[in-house]
Amino acid sequence: MSAFFDLLKSQTASHPPIWLLRQVGRYMPPYQELKGSQSLKTFFHNTEAIVEATLLGPSLLHVDAAILFADILSILDGFAVTYDFAPGPRIQFSPEQPFTFTSDPQTIFSYLLDAIRTLKQKLPVPLIVFAASPFTLACYLIDGGASKDFSKTMSFLYVYPEKFDQLISTIIEGTAIYLKTQMDAGAAAVQLFESSSLRLPSALFTRYVTEPNRRLIAKLKEQAIPVSLFCRCFEENFYTLQATQADTLHPDYHVDLHRIQKNLMLSLQGNLDPAIFLLPQEKLLHYVEAFLVPLRTYPNFIFNSGHGILPETPLENVQLVVSYVQRQL
């Protein structure tokens, strides 16, 4: 059984639950209107904006879950790390600087917690909150933002493995507090994002991805929190993620969900290539149907994308996919 799946399945009896990565974003005209000329950081710290943006998912798409409108860098407020968006993330961090998590998350994250309390009253569906998994957040910190190869992180990892392990441990402790605080405010489930894991050689995957996520999830399970783990990886590494004890595993589009579902009996979420949403609608539905056929009888399946919806995606295409899935299954 999967607590994450059961939570979402409670919303529908006729079809597998459906929600999407980055289901609220630049591809939505109402989102663009809501954001206006605000900077991203200002927008992410505006309680009213967080509420209104989060509500766009269920109101425009009729999905079975909402995900809090925030950023994976929002947690850095709790570590007193300076960051901004220009437009991509820029982080001011040195592995040599003191790095501890706040003892007062209620105050530091009041803008998020107030939004969650409001959303709990307004949403017709469960609210998912999220965080970067430990390795991914470490990559962003050491490289100072997003990177194609995370060369600074990999160099630091190889030269200073003990310091890197300590950084991972501190991230685990802080992330657990960050997410538990949001759950206490009224969120229903957690999604973890291991988005930088493709950078690791297979020989290091268990040490830096599987094991840190297992440790983090164990802390969340102290409060019986439903957890889904998204991970960018190839099939050979995906199987090791069973050891994390996540309720639901969510591979990106590199993994053949049709093949792995034959070898696993656990809750799976995913993993339609977001590029498919760009197709003309007739071709779009052809690919969605082909994706769904082998999964119709798979228990504990949650329909989702294999990465975030692309900014150039037509809103009506996303609405069509959600409607189609809910009618067909």
From Swiss-Prot:
Family, per entry: Belongs to the uroporphyrinogen decarboxylase family.
Described function: Catalyzes the decarboxylation of four acetate groups of uroporphyrinogen-III to yield coproporphyrinogen-III.
Entries under InterPro entries matching the protein: UROD/MetE-like_sf, Uroporphyrinogen_deCO2ase_HemE, Uroporphyrinogen_deCOase
Site (Transition state stabilizer) location in chain: D71
Gene that this polypeptide is encoded by: hemE
GO biological process entries: protoporphyrinogen IX biosynthetic process
Subunit structure: Homodimer.
Pathway annotation: Porphyrin-containing compound metabolism; protoporphyrin-IX biosynthesis; coproporphyrinogen-III from 5-aminolevulinate: step 4/4
Pfam families documented for this protein: URO-D
GO cellular component, one term: cytosol
Keyword Glycoprotein annotated: no
Record-listed E.C. numbers: 4.1.1.37
EC main group: lyase
The protein, known as: Uroporphyrinogen decarboxylase
Keyword annotations: Cytoplasm, Decarboxylase, Lyase, Porphyrin biosynthesis
Organism in which the protein naturally occurs: Chlamydia pneumoniae
Subcellular location: Cytoplasm
Keyword set includes Lyase: yes
Gene Ontology MF terms in the entry: uroporphyrinogen decarboxylase activity
Reactions that this protein is recorded to catalyse: uroporphyrinogen III + 4 H(+) = coproporphyrinogen III + 4 CO2
PROSITE patterns to which the protein is assigned, alphabetical: UROD_1, UROD_2
Extent of the signal sequence: none
Cited SUPFAM superfamilies: UROD/MetE-like
Binding site for substrate: R22, Q23, V24, G25, R26, D71, Y140, S195, H307
